[in-house]
UniProtKB/Swiss-Prot annotation:
GO molecular function: methionyl-tRNA formyltransferase activity
Record's GO cellular component terms: cytosol
Positions with a binding annotation for (6S)-5,6,7,8-tetrahydrofolate: 111-114
Reactions performed catalytically: L-methionyl-tRNA(fMet) + (6R)-10-formyltetrahydrofolate = N-formyl-L-methionyl-tRNA(fMet) + (6S)-5,6,7,8-tetrahydrofolate + H(+)
Name of the protein described by the UniProt record: Methionyl-tRNA formyltransferase
Family membership: Belongs to the Fmt family.
EC top class, as a word: transferase
InterPro entries per record: Fmt, Formyl_trans_C, Formyl_transf_N, Formyl_transf_N_sf, Formyl_transferase-like_C_sf, GART_AS, Met-tRNA-FMT_C, Met-tRNA-FMT_N
Record has NAD as a keyword: no
Gene3D superfamilies in the cross-refs: 3.40.50.12230
NCBIfam families: fmt
Source species: Ehrlichia canis (strain Jake)
Amino acid sequence: MKIIFMGSPEFSVSALSYLLENESHEVVAVYTKIPKPAGRRGRILTKTPVHIIAEQNNIEVNTPKSLKHDAEQEKILSLNPDVIVVVAYGLIIPQGVLSIPKYGCINIHPSLLPRWRGAAPIHYAILSGDDKTGVTIIQMNELLDEGDILLQRDIPIDEQDNIDTLSKKLAHLGSSMLIEVLDNIDNLVPIKQNNDDATYAHKIIDFHIDFNEAADVICRKVRALYPRAFLLFNGKRLRILKTSYYSDSSVQDLKPGAVIDSHMNIKCKDGVLVPLVVQMEGKNPCNIDDFILGYNVLNCSIA
């Protein structure tokens, strides 16, 4: 089967690698996000992980800013794909592209659709305390994550899973499912999603810890936003990379955000947050025991 692969971040690499290792299918081209300026004054262009893997395997790479133009759609048509596989590409796939391949466009989505449609499904599964999540492979249409389900499988969410570890698990699950779908595509019976059960995982832009939330909620936030959740420590950004929590009725009269002991345990709206691994801006990550050696945490400012 001739395949065009569309993907960009590290999550997409596993699926592309599975396809490249499978002799039954041929990746004729890769589409990925345009390289981003990086380094001083933006003089260095950083390619996506998918871009790098494709070049290493001598596959044609295309980085259009949009797929809406006729010229781009004609180029895809000329490649004569049997199917287009989309995994966290980052661009809208217009109807003109969806209708080109014999088998249309299929998408690997890391949630149990229709739960957690949208940009951040893995984050929201952790944030919401879901006990399981999974991968859904859908036949794409023009609506966001609303296509018919071709295959769906679930996995448990471990109490210690963060966005990094859970993403890797789902990437490998989705990759094996992709091969199964492609090998059996003529025999699959698509299942329509129930829109009444839909929930949405919008892009997350706020990574600041709010101690007016319960300690268990903050712990999930640290795992879901790893490694970006932070608080302000004496006015400087301190990333919180790993935590635990406990209940303590003796501190219930303290204000949320108060440091309650020399280990820098912090009062929350409900419960006490225990930072375990932290990272001060400009510094390397360290265990909390090493961090507090350099500070009088009982007299610090936490916000």
